[in-house]
Amino acid sequence: VFYMDNSFPESWKKYIKAGEEEWKDTFERIGFKNAIVAKDFPVNDPEFDPDNVKFSCVRYSPSQVANAMGPSWTDPRTGEILNASVYLYHNLIQLVHDWRFLQTSPADPDARKVILDEDVLGNCIRYVVSHEVGHCLALMHNMSGSAAIPTDSLRSPSFTQTYGTTYSIMDYARNNYIAQPGDKERGVKLTPPKLGLYDYFTIQWLYTPLLDAKSSKDEVPTLSRWITEKSGNPVYRYGKQQISSRLDPSSVEEDLGDDPVKAAGYGIQNLKYELAHLSEWVKDTD
C-alpha cells in the first residue's frame, strides 16, 4: 500500500494514484492480484504516522526543488524492501511543463501554453510517479530503454501507440521530440509509455515465486535462463546510468532512438519551429 499525502492539490490526486497503480499489471502477470494499492492518508487513525517506516507513502513537499525521488530502505540481510516512499516537490510541475512544452509543442497545440491543461499536466505527473515507484520496487535507471527503437519509428502512429518513446519507463526518455508538426494528427503518440517491455520482464525476474526452489541458490538456473533467453534482444538490454564519463553512447540521458544524429536533427527542427512561433503562442499570457 502507498498512502497518498492529503496535502497534494486535489487535481493531482487521480494522476498520482494512476502512476502508483500502473505497476499492478506487471504483478498480475506473475500471479499477484492487487499487489500495489494507492490509498489516501488515513484520517483519525492514531496508528498511522507517515514518518514511521511501517508506512510507504507518496509525500508532498512544498519546495522550490523541481524534481521527485523514490528511495527505499531494505533489510541488508535479505534484501527485503522495508519501506519505499515517493517524494514529489511542488516545483515538479515547472519541470514537467518545460519538458512537455519544449519537446512536443511543435507537434501538439495542447503543449503550447504557459499553464498546461489539467489532463496534460496530470499525465506528466502520472509518468513521474510511475517512474519513481519503479525505483521503490528496486529498478534502477535504464538509460538504454530507447536505444533499440529505430528513430523513424518514433514518427509511426502504430509503433508509438504500442510502445511510446521507450521500452522502459526507467529510462530518461521523456516526450517524443522526434515527432514533427502534423504527426499528432496522424496518430503519433507524444508521451512516454505507461510501462515498457523491459519493465515487465524485470518485475518477472525479480518477483516471480520459484516454488520448487528450496534456497536462493536453487533459483539461479531459472533466473539465468530467463536472462539468456533475452540476451540477444536489445529491447531488454540494461544500460547503466553513466555519472561522470559518457563511454557508451547508447546509454545516455534524455535521448531517443537508435540514431542520435538523426534524432538531434529532428529535435533541432522542432526548436527552430518553436523560435518562429513562440511569440504567437504566449502573446495572450502574462
Please tell me what each predicted stretch does.
Residues 1, 58-67, 71-115:
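Active-site-adjacent "gating/activation" loops or surface patches in catalytic cores
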Residues 1-45, 49, 88:
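Fold-level signature of zinc-dependent metallopeptidase catalytic domains
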Residues 6-8, 40-42, 62-64, 78, ...:
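Short, flexible loop/turn elements at secondary-structure junctions
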Residues 8-12, 111-129:
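Short pre-active-site segment immediately N-terminal to the catalytic Zn-binding motif
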Residues 17-20, 122, 126, 268, ...:
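Extracytoplasmic/secreted envelope proteins and their assembly/folding machinery
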Residues 23, 79, 138:
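Divalent metal-coordination and catalytic microenvironments
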Residues 146-286:
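Conserved catalytic/binding loops enriched for acidic/polar residues
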